Amino acid sequence: MSSLMISTAMKGKAPYRQVRDGYIAQPHNCAYHCLKISSGCDTLCKENGATSGHCGHKSGHGSACWCKDLPDKVGIIVHGEKCHR
């Protein structure tokens, strides 16, 4: 009975979307560099499906765009790896 109630309660809800927070990456684990006074990161992050973004500091990469709720299909900087163009 309880499984019927759960499946009924789930009807009409949006499909589950996997997201995470992180520094959005260009190819080769490179950062999108930014200026703290610019809204460029918020725009970049939203264009890639995140809810928001801002300019932060990523150790080893410098200033970089950080995104909130970025879809899993969009790459983020891998910790411990340098940009290798």
UniProtKB/Swiss-Prot annotation:
Signal sequence annotation: 1-18
GO terms for biological process, alphabetical: defense response
Keyword Metal-binding assigned: no
One Pfam family from the record: Toxin_3
GO MF entry, a single one: toxin activity
Tissue expression notes: Expressed by the venom gland.
Entry note about domains: Has the structural arrangement of an alpha-helix connected to antiparallel beta-sheets by disulfide bonds (CS-alpha/beta).
Family to which this protein belongs: Belongs to the long (4 C-C) scorpion toxin superfamily. Sodium channel inhibitor family. Alpha subfamily.
Protein name: Alpha-insect toxin Bot14
Source species of the chain: Buthus occitanus tunetanus
